């Protein structure tokens, strides 16, 4: 994960997306244009996993963020999830698949959960929660372009397989207000 965070930082420096940061309460709607989203997608390398924040605003009772996530197919993928499984304590995530397909496992119980530490870079991407070694008794579903998945806070989730690659937009609603405003 630290390599992913370093890569995200490199992308942010090399190919910044034109979005202004603000910590002031919004007095009108925040807009992310199709052009902004397209630029973010083009800046993502095809062979690296990336979770890029585009905009996060103070939504009153929760911070609400829009992210673009890209996951390439990994050579060691099999029928079980052994890494990159999460449960978010106070963040609901809504996935909109933009391109590609994969098998998403949700529900059940996170295997060997370890809370995200305060210095974990993922904390600023997903909010508070735990990472695990897999999901026990979860439900596997194939998702593809155009599909929308709502993952409530407290529901374990992770991909058991990716077909070539998958890119999706994520709306994260963080009632813990850990996601930094951007």
For the regions a language model picked out, list residue spans one by one.
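Bacterial N-terminal signal peptides that target proteins for export
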Residues: 1-8
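Bacterial N-terminal signal peptides
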Residues: 8-18
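A short, N-terminal "cap"/entry segment at the start of jelly-roll beta-barrel domains
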Residues: 19-89
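His/acidic/aromatic-lined binding-pocket segments of jelly-roll/cupin-type domains
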Residues: 84-87, 93-96, 140-141, 148-149
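Short, conserved beta-strand element in jelly-roll/cupin
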Residues: 89-104, 108, 118-131
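Short alpha-helix capping/helix-loop boundary micro-motifs
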Residues: 133-138
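Conserved metal-binding segment of the jelly-roll/cupin
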Residues: 142-156, 160-162
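A short hydrophobic beta-strand segment most commonly corresponding to one strand
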Residues: 164-180
